[in-house]
Amino acid sequence: MTPELNSFPRLAPGCRLNEKNQQPRTLLMPERALRLNGPSLEIVERCDGQHTVQQIIVEVQKIYSKAEPHKVEQDILGYLALLQKERALDFAL
């Protein structure tokens, strides 16, 4: 399911990012972990319940300004949907 643009993604209970000084940055989930870098890290760091999906898209598009904006948006929406399916994210309206 595609996340709504006005929703606020946040890490699901039991999920967290490892400390910033620990490399590689990792999304820790119950009984598994996902290494993050580049765009995936930029996205997950903003999933704090304070940024809307739309705000995350705009901020990441600024970072990757040479990429086609529509492609960046679709990639972000797809990644957020994947993390939701994996129960790593919750969304609030």
What are these regions (language model features)?
Residues 33-93:
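Long, charge-rich, low-complexity alpha-helical segments
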Residues 1-31:
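Long, low-complexity, charged/polar intrinsically disordered regions in eukaryotic proteins
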